Amino acid sequence: MKIEYLGHSCFRITDENGVSLLTDPYSGVGYELPPRLCADIVTVSHGHFDHNATHLVKAEKVINAVGMYETNGVKVVGIPSYHDEKYGALRGENVVFKWEMDGLTICHFGDLGEPCNASLVEKIGKTDILLIPVGGRYTIDAKGAKQFVDAIAPNIVIPMHYKPADGTIDITDAEEFLGFFDGVLRVGDAPVHITADEVTKGRKIIFMERKH
């Protein structure tokens, strides 16, 4: 599969058959999505402007709620969670999305803010590739993200929702989170290609940057 990081919490993941899933399209974060974006499936973790700009993406199917879905041969599960450490009292609910492509399970945390807990970890279950926020303030921070990584034990971890070098959004960069791990693979703004064989080689932390 091919993983492209488009900034903030937005990725486009394309399987070997050409089916694409795009997560949390954004607006109003100080930089813009690439123009003329297309995807077969779009997931939206919650209704805030920096995660639900579906009008900027040409998509066949938008999924924005808890539940089980199947479209274009991809099974998607929306898992209930919360946007803040007070379990929704501050910023409401959030949907963690998990799906399978090319025999691998991918989990996107959206704007998860609730602390690591056994109930949510159990609902998420086995995960090969974890896309996780690390910037704090509106989501879990670096330490909170590390706790989830330790609890879920994914094979590949890609941080998101951090302040980029040219960003103005009031969250932190990814360096504290990356500092918890050895051998971080920094790929710049290049897409990442992952096969099932790669996930058997031990945990890998991949730091992706938005293409300017």
Briefly describe each language-model feature range:
Residues 50, 138-139, 163-167:
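Short gly/pro/ser/thr-enriched loop/turn and capping motifs at secondary-structure boundaries
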Residues 10-47, 51-66, 77-94, 112-123:
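Pre-active-site segment of Zn-dependent metallo-hydrolases
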